[in-house]
Amino acid sequence: MAPLPPRGLVPSLLWCLSLFLSLPGPVWLQPSPPPHPSPRAEPHPCHTCRALVDNFNKGLERTIRDNFGGGNTAWEEEKLSKYKDSETRLVEVLEGVCSRSDFECHRLLELSEELVENWWFHRQQEAPDLFQWLCSDSLKLCCPSGTFGPSCLPCPGGTERPCGGYGQCEGEGTRGGSGHCDCQAGYGGEACGQCGLGYFEAERNSSHLVCSACFGPCARCTGPEESHCLQCKKGWALHHLKCVDIDECGTEQATCGADQFCVNTEGSYECRDCAKACLGCMGAGPGRCKKCSRGYQQVGSKCLDVDECETVVCPGENEKCENTEGGYRCVCAEGYRQEDGICVKEQVPESAGFFAEMTEDEMVVLQQMFFGVIICALATLAAKGDLVFTAIFIGAVAAMTGYWLSERSDRVLEGFIKGR
């Protein structure tokens, strides 16, 4: 059993501090573990190769800027001609191509380092675009702009304007992807060259297409007005060149459960739960029930709760009935409590005496003070020679002492003995 803290503010604080410091070091000094990082998707190899080439080109600019720029022009030109295509410059550039934590870049650089050296010393003149030569032609990780897939096929809409300029060709520039066009809002078709559902052609020429939104519920239209509708969206019907809402609740389209009712909404419908009082319903509330649930009864046009407590439904001794919505429950009557399935009378705790909350030490101090006062009073009365008042006082003290000892006899006697 854990030790109880001492009484008093200062002793309690010292006790808590000693308990805290008694804990083993790893328990209260060890920091909480860091959260597990979420898994990171690996980039496409083409994207890694493009980043490598971009950093390579930045390195070329950096090495020229750091080594030359300002001074003797003739001397710089002579030195630059030697440094420009030197192995020293290549090493300096390659050292800064990949960041320390970019493992994909380091792996790709290790695989392609000989190709980069070959391009640096022998192929720069015939293939000045390192990205095209390395990533597309040599490693075959990428495709030219506007193409996709293992064979670098043209994206829908052509390589000049993939997806008509109104969408994104999936896998463009890589050896992967499907080439499917993900069109912008309002555009559709295989190459995003048409207006999508709910839009109409506001402007079109050989290189330009503007799609604007139709009136709310229109699926196809010739203009922005309500009367321009040609076809309506699902949940609407064309009536006199206008789209009107279909009330699905009056058709077989609505499929609600047995204890639900249908509510029509714009272009659709909702199924909502019947009231608790209903066993099937035609709408909200206890007045729209088809039948009443158990615990309810028909009163006029509504299903209302039955008060089961009007009849004797709680046979147990000292039980009483409490009505609930659609039912009832049996609980113990006031002054009783549940115990092992039956209601038993609650025991009222006896009121504590005057000395009930006092500790042993406090009793000893009080006892010593009490008897000290008695001895002092007796000595004073005896010194005055007043035998009558002395006798009365001794009798009163004896009566009080007898009552006190009857309440706390064991503890007082023990304290008295210890006090002596």
Curated annotation (Swiss-Prot):
Gene3D superfamilies cross-referenced by the UniProt entry: Laminin (2.10.25.10), Plasmodium vivax P25 domain (2.90.20.10)
The keyword Isomerase is annotated on this UniProt entry: yes
Tissue expression summary: Expressed in myoblast C2C12 cells (at protein level).
Topology class, membrane: Multi-pass membrane protein
GO cellular component entries: glutamatergic synapse; membrane; synapse
Transmembrane region(s): 363-383, 385-405
Keyword Transmembrane: yes
InterPro entries: DUF3456, ECM_structural_protein, EGF-like_Ca-bd_dom, EGF-like_dom, EGF-type_Asp/Asn_hydroxyl_site, EGF_Ca-bd_CS, Furin_repeat, Growth_fac_rcpt_cys_sf
Top class in the EC scheme: isomerase
Glycosylation sites: 205
Documented EC number(s): 5.3.4.1
Signal peptide: 1-29
UniProt cross-references to CDD domains, sorted A to Z: EGF_CA, FU
Domain of life: Eukaryota
SMART domains for the chain: EGF (SM00181), EGF_CA (SM00179), FU (SM00261)
Topological domains annotated Cytoplasmic: 384
UniProt function note: Protein disulfide isomerase. Promotes the localization of acetylcholine receptors (AChRs) to the plasma membrane.
Protein name as annotated: Protein disulfide isomerase Creld1
Species of provenance: Mus musculus
Gene name linked to the record: Creld1
